[in-house]
Amino acid sequence: MSAKKNKKKKPIVIKTSACRKIKRSDGLKMKWVQEYTFRGFLEAITSRFGNLKAYSIFGDEEDKFISYNRLKWGAENISTYLLEKGFAKGDRVAIVGESCPFWMMMYLGITYVGCVAVPILPDFSQREMEGILKESGAKAVCVNVKHFKKVEKYAYSNNLMVVRMEDLTQIPSIPEGFTFENAPGISLKEHSHNYTLINTSVPSEDDMASLIFTSGTTGSSKGVILTHKNLLVCADESSDTYVKVKKGVRVLSILPMSHCYEFTITHLLCLLQGAEIVFLGKPPATTILMRAFKEVRPHVILTVPLLIEKIYKAAVLPTLRDNPKIAKLYKNPLTKWIVLKTVKTKLISTMGGCIRFFGIGGAPLDETVWDFLYSCHFPYALGYGLTETSPLIAGCGPKHKMHKKGYIGKPVKHDHVILLNKNEDGVGEIAVKGPNVMTGYYNNEELNKEVFTEDGYFKTGDLGYLDKHGYLSIRGRVKTMILGPAGENIYPESIESLINNMEFVQDSLVVPGDGGLVALIKIDLEAMQEKLKISATDVKDEAEKYLVKLKKSVNEQLSTFSKIADTELQEKDFERTPTQKIKRFLYSRKKKEEK
């Protein structure tokens, strides 16, 4: 045989550029899909990746996975079942539960025929869930066993179809002697699909796909209307700005899928490019994460800042601060790079050794942690956006040369970002217009008039700065910005970043008080007790004394108008939204004005 015949064939690789063929009259250029609908999405991913692994769960057996073909097959069966039960385009189906393959299969089955998915964050209370089911007009709810009790009363008393998420089985009722977990029912995913029926209910790009009720830090929850086009344009275009993955890349899914950042970027974007997504399947405790990192060896992780901040405070900061030799090397500009390179290698090894993209979004990243990641060239990437923008507005990839210190990155393609009411420093409210921006808030015309400008820009409520190269820097929230004694703008997030990097500090919140700024500070009392060798009865008094020293140290680093006037020891954990933002509205220290 000739050498030519023995030569191995090169694997076929679908290049991004080869997919960029479809130009549209609206200026968009589709890369991965034929149309921006979830029907088009499923057709695209199965035609290219058919029998490849789409989903698996950490800890499951190797052969227990869902392929791209199986995902589409199950979704079509669900679609058929819904239509046979009288559901029509626009009807709402709620999804409540932790992330798993059947969560996505249910979502795709709902939207494949133009029904609307109502993802509900599993951390919501029973009262909040019942309110969302009522306000959305849901005709069905898919819920896992863990959260069933939160919806049981409302669902059955209002004749909603109830589907058990663990096996996608409708449970019409729970017979005596059974529980929701083992009650008999009718399988949706095994139901025979009917293409003739499915093709009578075809969604369009501008149809509502998701109705998402946000969990705000201000205490109000709003229904965000996102269309098929909103979500899929964001996923399609974000592969240029934010994250590019290849076929077969392993992605570790940690966040709830009802979180728009997780849904659009981890799932839609990565499925469009043939990734294998592995669900953590358990609460992200440190021990579980370490095992998952070691066994899954992910290439891609997307998470909220709290995770990397915890890793930094637990593994990195003590090394840089408490080891005298390393601390000395780190402070010396000539030897700092040696420490950074060593710590970076250790950090990547801790995450399984294969990490190529560590996406951070959903909340502001601590400035000290950000500076460390930037300095050691860790493959992180920041993303900025809101549920209302599907969610990505701006970001950058993990390559160091794409990063600019203090800046999130550039706006995604087709998004136009402007700043409203800029001050003398060029800081203003970020406003955005683009195909990923929501059509509006559900049943709230008054609020829609308030958040959209006359020329169609959505006002984000965030303060930002755009440099001459188009890089966006986030400076804080309009509603959390505090006015100083002479009208100065004070950004509490910057002060909190300084406090959080002090020894023993677990968390902090800076709020306005009647006598100036008040810092509520959560101290790690166990760590303090252990290091100072004091008794449990004395540690609280010691913590109060420590706050006095902390206040002095932090104030030395602040301008006169943003100095802390008082500190309080925060004994309980701060209440947070499911995206780990502190609910600031609960902690005001200003006395109500007397009427």
Spans of model-derived segments:
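Conserved AMP-binding/adenylate-forming core of the ANL superfamily
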Residues: 54-100, 104-108, 125-130, 228
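Conserved ATP-binding/catalytic segment of the ANL
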Residues: 425-484, 501
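Conserved AMP-binding/adenylation subdomain of ANL enzymes
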Residues: 232-250, 257-344, 354, 379
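Conserved AMP-binding A3 loop
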Residues: 65-69, 209-235
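Conserved C-terminal "lid"/linker of ANL adenylate-forming enzymes
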Residues: 482, 507-510, 515, 549-595
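Conserved pre-ATP/AMP-binding loop-to-beta segment of ANL
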Residues: 50-53, 183-213, 220, 244-250
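ANL superfamily adenylate-forming
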Residues: 150-205, 315-346
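Conserved ATP-dependent adenylate/AMP-binding module captured primarily in the ANL superfamily
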Residues: 122-156, 234-252, 285-299
